[in-house]
Amino acid sequence: MLDRIQVKQLTGALIVVTFLVIALGGVVRIYDAGESCPDWPTCFGTWDFDISEAEQGAWYEANPDEIDSRGAGHRYTTFQIFTEWAHRLLAGVVLGPLVLLNWLLVRREEELGSEVKLASSVAVALIVWQGAVGWLTVRMDNEHWSVALHLGSALAFMLSLIWLWLATARDLGEQPEWATFDPVLAARWRNRLAWISAATLFTLFSGAFVSTTAGANTSCGVNGLYDSWPLCQGEFLPSIHDWVMQSQVIHRWLVVAVEVALLAASYIIWKEIGEGQSGSTLCKLIWGATGLYLVNIGIGASYILSWDMTDGYLEYLSLVHLMLASLTFLVLATAWLGSTIALNERGS
């Protein structure tokens, strides 16, 4: 049966599953369910998710050191518990074993070189690390820094899978056109892409910090168009008195800086291709990332402007905002990875 499973296809499936795990993590956050399973890897001492409020209370009485950060009387709905339970199930029961299986399959394929083996080992190390960070996030009651670390580790793991897929496709001679990078243009753009990708990731972290810090979401006000967005409390450049509570302002400044860099990159690579340089793959990826980023700015604005005195924000917009931000980073990081692989191939 294992002979029928191909590394390239399994790796592609793992990339999709990882993106779903990240999305489920976002669902956990928007439903405020990060502490709905206060222990790890079990959930209120069981492997189930259908736990009544009475059963939750009994567990807290037996574990007085594990009181919820929202107060001793706080209880969770079955749906909230299910979101965290499903997130753990998909990551630990589905994703983890398949990553190990992929590692074994890589070593059975004679056509695959040392880079593929290295990438598969990195993926295994990162999935183990991600499990440890997940435990830490639970232990720290979803502190903002632990949530950002958990998200960053997930993106690093997904990037290792993309690296594995690209290297496998190259070794098998099955690279599609969209994954074929011109080494001349790659040499010019690799460092630029590294800096832009890093800036995009840092901006993503700042957004995660805002969304998990009490009061930060409303720090620019809830007075609607212009006053709350694009301005902040009616000011274009408000003074910073509290770096934590006003982290949304800093996040917005970072967003503007990255978007300017992306627009500049899109223009420069368009000019270079127009002057006879090949490399349409790189151009499409940079343009795609720029387009995603622009759309995501609109999603972020819609989230801020969605405030309602009764229902608060439309939290599903926050989830879309997270996923588009993650996708933008992954597109840019894939462009950097592809450029690096193309340069290594030319140098070998």
Tell me what each language-model feature is.
Residues 1-348:
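Polytopic transmembrane helical bundles with strong interfacial aromatic enrichment
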